[in-house]
Design a protein with these regions (language model features):
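Conserved "HGTGT" condensation-loop signature of ketosynthase/thiolase-family condensing enzymes
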Residues: 1-92, 109-113, 123-145
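Flexible, low-hydrophobicity surface segments
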Residues: 116-119
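Conserved phosphate-binding catalytic cores of ATP/NTP-utilizing and phosphoryl-transfer enzymes
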Residues: 101-109
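Active-site nucleophile and cofactor-binding loops and adjacent substrate-binding regions
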Residues: 90-100
Length: 145
């Protein structure tokens, strides 16, 4: 990071030891025609919260990837409402193959920077359950900014 006032280069502060992944969970996998993307996301979130030993009310940040099988422009907002939480920090990301790593980096920075204490990092989709080429194209078209 550059310091414009003095022209000097400032050392970045390490966040090592300040943030941690404290829980992990997953949903059913495979063809699950009776489950919506939201239901699958909820399964994974509940499992992660149980693994972490924290309550739903303690989640104050949500980062999600886009869901191709669900037409939500801001999946993090739609999921938060579905899951019954009101985060102060939220975003939906799509960075191709780097989405998961990017979400974890942003979550760590948000926690270290004081924007949130517990960030739910979530990716969910239902690609084996009825995602047609038309639905995929429509989802991508409707989600663009």
């Amino acid at each position: 990071m550059a310091n414009r006032a003095s022209g000097a280069i400032a050392r970045q502060r390490s966040i090592r030891g300040q943030v941690a992944i404290v829980g992990a969970g997953r949903s059913e996998v495979g063809r699950v025609p009776d489950k919506s993307v939201m239901a699958l996301a909820s399964q994974a979130a509940k499992a992660a919260l149980a693994d972490a030993g924290i309550k739903r009310s303690q989640i104050d940040g949500v980062l999600t990837s886009s869901a191709f099988a669900a037409p939500f422009h801001r999946f993090s907002v739609a999921f938060s409402e579905y899951f019954g939480i009101v985060p102060t920090f939220s975003n939906t990301l799509q960075v191709s193959g780097a989405t998961a790593a990017t979400m974890f980096n942003i979550a760590a920075a948000a926690i270290a920077g004081g924007l949130a204490e517990n960030v739910l990092v979530l990716g969910a989709d239902s690609l084996l359950t009825g995602l047609s080429p038309d639905l995929a194209l429509r989802s991508m078209t409707e989600s663009r900014d």
